[in-house]
Amino acid sequence: MNNDAKFPIQLTDFAARKVKFFTENEIINSNSHLKLRVYIIGGGCSGFQYRFILDDKISSDDCIVENNGVSLVIDPMSLQYLFGGIIDYYEGLEGSRFVVINPNAKNTCSCGSSFSV
């Protein structure tokens, strides 16, 4: 496992508070071992899509970033697309969601969930 000192990706304080809220919420059985995993899949209108899940499994080659007791987990393949990025949480009229501020994205779709490099 790697830490955030080697891999420059940030989890904002607000996003960390939201992860903590979700993992402590009764709906998901108060599993404090859950971590926010962000990963990339092919698809979407721009070629790649961001996905987020709460996960309790960690691989030995995953990158782990900590903020206020909350862990963000990224697999090595996804990390190459997210390097230097910021994971945040957005709340607005159209809903709320985790978002990626990705300096590697050349183009993004209007909803912000897909990108190209």
From Swiss-Prot:
Q: Where does iron-sulfur cluster bind?
A: 45, 109, 111
Quote the cofactor binding remark. Answer: Binds 1 iron-sulfur cluster per subunit.
Its keywords, alphabetically, are: Iron, Iron-sulfur, Metal-binding
What Pfam families does UniProt report for this protein, alphabetically?
Answer: Fe-S_biosyn
UniProt cofactor(s): iron-sulfur cluster
* GO cellular component entries: cytosol
Record-level Gene Ontology MF annotations: 2 iron, 2 sulfur cluster binding; 4 iron, 4 sulfur cluster binding; iron ion binding
What PROSITE patterns would the database entry show? HESB (PS01152)
Name the domain of life this protein comes from: Bacteria
Q: Which GO terms describe its biological process?
A: iron-sulfur cluster assembly
Q: Could you confirm whether the keyword rRNA processing appears in this record?
A: no
Q: What does this protein do?
A: Required for insertion of 4Fe-4S clusters for at least IspG.
Q: How does it assemble?
A: Homodimer.
Member of which family? Belongs to the HesB/IscA family.
Annotated PANTHER family: IRON-SULFUR CLUSTER ASSEMBLY 2 HOMOLOG, MITOCHONDRIAL
What is the designated name of this protein? Iron-sulfur cluster insertion protein ErpA
- Species of origin reads Blochmanniella pennsylvanica (strain BPEN)
What lineage, starting at the top, does this entry show? Bacteria, Pseudomonadati, Pseudomonadota, Gammaproteobacteria, Enterobacterales
